[in-house]
Design a protein with these regions (language model features):
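NAD(P)H-binding glycine-rich loop region in Rossmannoid oxidoreductase-like domains
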Residues: 3-43
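Conserved cofactor-binding/catalytic machinery of classical short-chain dehydrogenase/reductase
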Residues: 8, 21, 48-51, 63, ...
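Conserved Rossmann-fold NAD(P)-dependent oxidoreductase catalytic core, especially the SDR/UDP-sugar
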Residues: 24, 43-81
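Active-site beta-alpha turn of Rossmann-fold NAD(P)-dependent dehydrogenases/reductases
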Residues: 26, 65-69, 106-108, 172
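Active-site segment of SDR-like NAD(P)-dependent oxidoreductases
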Residues: 29-32, 70-77, 108-111
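Conserved catalytic-core motifs of eukaryotic protein kinase domains, centered on the activation segment
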Residues: 32-39, 74-78, 116-117
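NAD(P)-dependent short-chain dehydrogenase/reductase
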Residues: 79-81, 85, 89-144, 149-158, ...
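C-terminal substrate-binding subdomain of Rossmann-fold SDR/epimerase-dehydratase oxidoreductases
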Residues: 132-265
Length: 265
């Protein structure tokens, strides 16, 4: 792994010159983080992407793969959505002017092991284990199509096929589910020991039923032939979170039996 800065053009050229395909996943990824830090979001997401595109052009990269979001369809998502929309336009211009091939991946709701602090499922699992309580803004009727991070990773490689060149691809789950059903599932897996509380939401940056209001280039959705079942994936995430926060934070208080390891592939 090389630790660096995506606005360091010299370092970018050194790294990118050794490759034929570039995956760009760097930048500010949390909606709240982007809302709180618009300047950093513009610098990392928009300017950073421009630096990477320029380096790809200079080094004759065969394909530029960009991690976008389903929020590009929306008028929600604050500066996060704005930055992703801007990046997609930049990519289109580099394709039109410099013939830089691309694939734009619009990710839906991801979950799985090693989730960061703003991942919804990862966050509520941590709440449940530490506090025996989940506080959710909204009424739980919000709809999401969750996809396990391993399934998303497989799809992100499959798009290297030639038919996905210069394409917009949606990577999301094969089934939709209400948020309240996710929370109830987590509660059941933890022996019904969790209190679930719904509070009025002051955050207007997240969608409830659908993100579709703004209309960018339409994307094809990859339908996964094989994928991780949602319940098993959430259970695996519970084990992973429990292991990471330590044995003193959940097992004794919640009176649940956790195996030492879980075989989840």
């Amino acid at each position: 792994m090389i630790v660096g800065d995506i606005v360091d053009s010299q370092q970018l050229n050194t790294v990118i010159s050794e490759n034929q395909i570039v995956y760009h996943f760097a930048g500010v990824a949390g909606i709240q983080d982007a809302s709180d830090n618009p300047i950093r979001t513009v610098k990392n997401n928009i300017l950073g992407t421009t630096y990477i595109l320029e380096s790809c052009k200079i080094n004759n990269i065969k394909r530029f793969v960009f991690a976008s979001s389903i929020y590009v369809y929306s008028d929600l998502g604050s500066f996060y959505r704005t930055s992703k929309q801007s990046c997609e336009l930049l990519i289109e211009n580099y394709n039109k002017i410099y013939d830089l091939n691309f694939t734009i991946l619009r990710y839906g709701a991801l979950y799985g092991r090693r989730a960061n602090e703003f991942n919804f499922i990862g966050n509520v699992i941590k709440q449940a284990l530490l506090d025996k309580k989940i506080v959710r803004e909204g009424n739980g009727e919000e709809i999401r199509d969750y996809i396990h991070v391993k399934d998303a990773a497989v799809a992100s490689v499959d798009i290297l096929e030639e038919k996905y060149n210069d394409s917009y691809i949606m990577i999301s789950g094969n089934q939709t589910v209400k948020v309240k059903d996710i929370l109830n599932m987590i509660n059941e897996m933890l022996n019904g020991a969790i209190k679930i509380e719904y509070v009025n939401s002051e955050n207007e940056d997240h969608y409830e039923i659908t993100p579709y209001t703004f209309r960018p280039r339409l994307a094809k959705k990859i339908l996964l032939k094989e994928y991780h079942e949602l319940g098993q994936g959430i259970l695996d995430s519970i084990y992973d979170t429990y292991k990471r926060i330590g044995k003193t934070s959940g097992k004794k208080d919640l009176n649940i039996v956790l195996p030492e390891s879980v075989d989840f592939k």
